[in-house]
């Protein structure tokens, strides 16, 4: 829900967001890069949890199934946590495997705006945060919220890049479409340098 409204935002840009595209360039953060070498964790690797958001964009049947084996990290605003808890309990979700991460969001597209997981040069599982390619400030804050919640190292760049446009094999090969070049106001070489840092 966009800033508490009852309308879910689409995966694409709304007309209002198109008019506010310039806000994206103000949402980024920049920290020191992680210590080298960095290994990007592939999505298909063994994991301990899954990140979702309330109101949900997936069925509670799927959430219930996930909760049998993994932790379900659920981004939820403080004023909606009781509702989320009730719905999950009434749907047979294993509540011992639900961990609420408190904070507002704008949409349920967590794969696009959520954290990117890496193993940094200190062998710490850490979060890499890229600026979300939508003017949705609450969504853009999700990786930092997760880092604070889990107390894991956090590394950010103001490079605009959506998680849905990124795949890695976890062994040093990654792929994205040219969208990452089109959305940033820097050269392709500079984008590549940031991604390889």
Question: What positions do the PLM features span?
Answer:
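The feature marks the mature, well-folded catalytic cores of soluble enzymes
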Residues: 1-197
């Amino acid at each position: 829900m966009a800033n508490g409204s009852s309308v879910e935002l689409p995966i694409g840009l709304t007309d209002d967001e198109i008019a506010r595209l310039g806000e994206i360039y103000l949402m980024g953060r920049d920290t020191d890069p992680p210590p080298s070498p960095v290994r990007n964790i592939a999505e298909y690797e063994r994991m301990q949890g899954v990140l979702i958001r309330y109101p949900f964009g997936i069925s509670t049947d799927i959430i219930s199934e996930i909760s049998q084996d993994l932790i379900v990290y659920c981004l939820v605003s403080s004023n909606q946590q009781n509702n989320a808890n009730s719905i999950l309990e009434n749907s047979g979700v294993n509540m011992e495997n639900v961990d609420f991460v408190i904070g507002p969001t704008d949409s349920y597209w967590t794969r696009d705006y959520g954290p990117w997981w890496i193993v940094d040069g200190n062998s710490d599982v850490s979060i890499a945060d890229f600026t979300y390619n939508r003017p949705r400030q609450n969504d853009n804050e999700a990786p930092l919220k997760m880092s604070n919640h889990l107390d894991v190292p956090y590394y950010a760049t103001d490079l605009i890049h959506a998680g849905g446009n990124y795949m890695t094999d976890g062994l040093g090969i990654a792929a994205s479409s040219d969208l990452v070049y089109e959305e940033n106001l820097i050269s392709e070489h500079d984008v590549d340098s940031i991604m390889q840092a």
